[in-house]
């Protein structure tokens, strides 16, 4: 049985997927997992493969969504993206790392897309 945080996370991912699709993204995969990382959503926007971290912020959450994706979390997502590309034999592919912030407000969601939230260096 899922707890309140898990429920909010699942609903936020569903809302984020619908939002991205409405923005013209094509969803490639959800909840991609490796031994070291999980990527919430892998999507395509035009010719760019986008790795998306979904951050749900409830009424009592502290900090913004960008701050919620720590440097360590960014590194895990980047590593997961490398595994994804390698497993599928994808080379010379344009990639981007976005964060979708899902704010729960008055039993509804407000969604913010943060493009290029972080990059590989």
UniProtKB/Swiss-Prot annotation:
It comes from the Bacteria. GO terms for molecular function: nucleic acid binding. InterPro entries: Restrct_endonuc-II-like, tRNA_endonuc-like_dom_sf, UPF0102_YraN-like. SUPFAM superfamilies: Restriction endonuclease-like (SSF52980). PANTHER family: UPF0102 PROTEIN YRAN. Belongs to the UPF0102 family. This is UPF0102 protein HRM2_30940. It comes from Desulforapulum autotrophicum (strain ATCC 43914 / DSM 3382 / VKM B-1955 / HRM2).
